[in-house]
Amino acid sequence: MNKGNLIKNYAVALFNNAIVDNIQDKIFEEITSINRIITDNFDIREFLFSPIVNKNDKINAVNSLAKNIKISTIVQNFLLLLVKNSRTAILSNIVDAYNTLLYESKNIKIVQVISANKLQPKEQEWIKSRIEKELNQKTEILFDIDNTIIGGIVIKYDSMLQDYSIKGSLEKITKALKTVNIAV
């Protein structure tokens, strides 16, 4: 099984368990919080991801963590499953996949907007409203910065890519010039 399918299967399993008790949002908050703790703490991350550390020690650590931060049994059991199957290293990917499932269940499209500089709140609101109008759907916009695009924005959702960046325009011009054999 490829990694993408594996990640999606774990996310779907967790999501389906959350649906049973109608706690999808709560589970997302918990799993995101756990992921942040693991990501932000080098020692915890190395301990849980290390193939050298005994699984029973990892299980005890997860149980202790769950007790200290008071997470649901669903999330605790899910983390234990990841430990037992040596899959803790893909937790961040599973959280992202779960997030996608959560938004899809609410008919909200996740859209990534990349700009060369940090956008002001009014600019973000304007972009969000334009995208929602174009898609005729509610969106969750993830604003990222990539100064290599020079200026403009790049919009990504599903398998779509709309490149309104200066870098993208320059690449198109370069490609067009090459097709007519003009040296660039």
UniProtKB/Swiss-Prot annotation:
Gene3D superfamilies: N-terminal domain of the delta subunit of the F1F0-ATP synthase. Keywords: ATP synthesis, Cell inner membrane, Cell membrane, CF(1), Hydrogen ion transport, Ion transport, Membrane, Transport. InterPro entries: ATP_synth_OSCP/delta_N_sf, ATPase_OSCP/dsu. SUPFAM superfamilies: N-terminal domain of the delta subunit of the F1F0-ATP synthase. It is found in: Cell inner membrane. It comes from the Bacteria. Its main location: membrane. It is a peripheral membrane protein. GO terms for cellular component: plasma membrane; proton-transporting ATP synthase complex. One of its GO terms (molecular function) is proton-transporting ATP synthase activity, rotational mechanism. The keyword Transcription does not apply. Belongs to the ATPase delta chain family. F-type ATPases have 2 components, F(1) - the catalytic core - and F(0) - the membrane proton channel. F(1) has five subunits: alpha(3), beta(3), gamma(1), delta(1), epsilon(1). F(0) has three main subunits: a(1), b(2) and c(10-14). The alpha and beta chains form an alternating ring which encloses part of the gamma chain. F(1) is attached to F(0) by a central stalk formed by the gamma and epsilon chains, while a peripheral stalk is formed by the delta and b chains. F(1)F(0) ATP synthase produces ATP from ADP in the presence of a proton or sodium gradient. F-type ATPases consist of two structural domains, F(1) containing the extramembraneous catalytic core and F(0) containing the membrane proton channel, linked together by a central stalk and a peripheral stalk. During catalysis, ATP synthesis in the catalytic domain of F(1) is coupled via a rotary mechanism of the central stalk subunits to proton translocation. HAMAP family: ATP_synth_delta_bact (MF_01416). NCBIfam families: ATP_synt_delta (TIGR01145). This is ATP synthase subunit delta. The lineage of its organism: Bacteria, Pseudomonadati, Pseudomonadota, Alphaproteobacteria, Rickettsiales. The gene is atpH.
